[in-house]
């Protein structure tokens, strides 16, 4: 293997990008990759831009896009071009660039580097099932790759739905150059004939990111290592178009303490959770900068400017960096200790004075207080991170501990999938689940008061869940399940099967 590439592709101005998909909450992994893209660009006198990959029209939302942009800005990242600030390569939302992708997909067909595939989803499912039964890797077998031009034109004329797939070699090895790994060899037999344009005319990630990176003059692509196996497809597309390929750098993925891929089922993963919990943006950015990377002087506490000034991408370690909340809290404490009392006062006021949240809290506690000082007792749980609870806190005359764990876990999974976080949707979900489990609503809700507020004596819990938001609610529910001892693998598997069979409680409303 070659030595890792240190090239910055100096013949081109350095331009990097982050391209989040607005399909959920702003993930710390997005901020992590964005940080290194920004730092690398600035360290080489270049530009960092942002674009939105919203080709998944069923899951992409304007609300999610706004949350992502707000969260990245809150943590201290900024971009010179993007959907909110404009720029010379607009538009920066892929959903607004469909004509561009269609033109390039047609260009690949004209050059015979791509073909139309008319296979139905049922045919593809059968094909994959047969391959798996034979111990083969499931991949498209090329059955439409050699259709005669006349046949293809006839099917298109008849209006038969089709996708556009890229052609790939059937033998040999693709050599991909990576800044951290040097030459990576991937057999072409492991590379699928990727769909480039879907039946609805929208591109897949693979076509859109290549076309956009070229048209937006991206010189370096720093992205998660989960994309390494897709690099041959992207490299091939650059060759097909006759374009210069950006330098690739596949960053190690963030891991849970047990070394598994960072996921919301084991750790809070949303930037907004850490903001609401009281982590300073400087501390979170500092911590993400330490993920798989060490400063030349081994400093643990450093600013973004200090990171940029001394950045050496070769200091990134390929071992999966552990995202440890306890270490983040320690680092946050270091930042807090360094503040003057006046600065700390202002930080606390900024953190606590989310006006929309405060108005909602005031409305919730207003019927319950006689003095302004009563607000402290009634509203404290809205601002804390995790309530001080133990297994005994959940003791209930009508429910066993096992029942409580299972209903909390089922509720957690249901709430994770809510399309919009609102009191109405929370109510419909929990009411439907209680009825499905044949548990009286009063009994069913008691453990939720404990999990969310730490007490059964609090403001209405579903209203409280709406106010503290999805991230904090889900984190407190996970904490409650853990406090109660959690679920073993067998019980978890059984419960997952039960969860898969639950009806859509929102549709029932």
UniProtKB/Swiss-Prot annotation:
Its cofactor is Zn(2+). Residues 1-21 are annotated as: Disordered. ATP binds at residue 264. InterPro entries: aa-tRNA-synth_I_cd-bd, aa-tRNA-synth_I_codon-bd_sub2, aa-tRNA-synth_I_CS, aa_tRNA-synth_I_cd-bd_sf, Glu-tRNA-ligase_bac/mito, Glu/Gln-tRNA-synth, Glu/Gln-tRNA-synth_Ib_cat-dom, GluQ/Sye. The keyword S-adenosyl-L-methionine does not apply. Keywords: Aminoacyl-tRNA synthetase, ATP-binding, Cytoplasm, Ligase, Metal-binding, Nucleotide-binding, Protein biosynthesis, Zinc. The keyword Disulfide bond does not apply. GO terms for cellular component: cytosol. A motif ('KMSKS' region) lies at residues 261-265. Residues 1-13 have a biased composition (Polar residues). Monomer. Belongs to the class-I aminoacyl-tRNA synthetase family. Glutamate--tRNA ligase type 1 subfamily. Catalyzes the attachment of glutamate to tRNA(Glu) in a two-step reaction: glutamate is first activated by ATP to form Glu-AMP and then transferred to the acceptor end of tRNA(Glu). This is Glutamate--tRNA ligase. It comes from Psychrobacter arcticus (strain DSM 17307 / VKM B-2377 / 273-4).
